[in-house]
Amino acid sequence: MSLITKRVYGAEDVLPKDSYKWQLIEDIMRSEAAAYGFKEIRTPVFEHTELFQRGVGDTTDVVQKEMYTFNTKGGTSLSLRPEGTSGAARAVLEHAVYNDGLPIKTYYFDSCYRYEKKQANRYREFHQFGAELYGASSPAADAEIISLAATLFDRLGVTDLQLELNSIGCPACRAEYHKALKKYFEGYKDKLCDTCLSRLEKNPMRILDCKSSVCSEIAKDAPVVLDYLCDDCKNHFQQVRAYLDAAEIPYIINPKIVRGLDYYTKTVFEFVTARLGSQGTVCGGGRYDGLIEELGGQHTPSLGFGLGMERLLALMEEQGIEIPLPPSCDIYIAGLGEEAQKKAFTLVKEVRETSLIAECDIVGRSLRAQMKYADKIGAKFSMVIGENEINENKAILKNMETGEKTEVPLDEQFINAFFHHYTEYQISGTANIEDIQ
């Protein structure tokens, strides 16, 4: 097969047989986000590379190994977004959205890009639902952002997930933690990978996020960040847990969670499952109080999360959660002959204006082929129009499920009457086809 007819390695097509699942999930997410007061934001798929270097962190795997970076003809370095938080923060800062009042609540559906080995439920192009909250330092804000994620899983019927919670402190108390980490890992310098050796001086906490099996094993006995929290961070974390307890959102404390991005401070969390193997983190996020300031703005306490759509869908399938099929065709109107086809085309247009689904022949099929097609697309009713039907102003209406046929008037009054009764038929499921006359 020619390369031009093959999708790029690490990317997937979402075909009509699956896209309806995405649409339904996205609709639920939009609805719940709106209930929490969040509004949609859309940002470019590429940004200045420096945005991610400063925001995500130049010692992270994401920036060092995984970004798609290129130079424009003018020599400007740009990168495809590897995550959504940095671009959303840049947009809020650039457009001074905070002038509209705080807090600012945004959500987005982003395609993101990371150059990494393709694995099950891990792709080079992947999709995220993200929610970001700016201008709130209260532990209640942490609980609200976590509550939104938990509510989404609830609405979708996903149950086999564990909320894991940690605090990685603020820059002040984390400085002491970094010293402890550095001292610990220096005892294993001969075993650390080259990347982690470079991190030892710049940001030893990133070693905890290393994917190397050797480094991961060493990190198991590393100092725990919770032991180094300052009083303010301890109190903040305690209050976050109190809010979650009050809302009856179950969680466990996992002191090993540090997240793979440098902008995080204080609360970090993940929703994980054992059903997806090594790619078990379906949603992750936390607080990033210094990000807006790092990008040149004023100090703006912020937090958010990203939820992987591919992993969510894989988990729903693994759990056997059935996503309802999209509505099928309500009526197929077949036309035989040029005049009848024009009449069918006109009637279909009128039917569609009632917000129901209607189709007619647009490829020149025979009547038999049209009926076969109507059955294939799951049409609930069909109607056949030919020369005789036009002359007599009558047509045959067929219930495709029962096979019952009824002769009905072929005029605008029929169309109105039909869809009035048909709407009742859809709701009750008991209407008799004769009621349409």
Residue ranges and their predicted role:
Residues 1-437:
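TRNA-recognition modules of translation machinery and tRNA-sensing kinases, especially anticodon-binding
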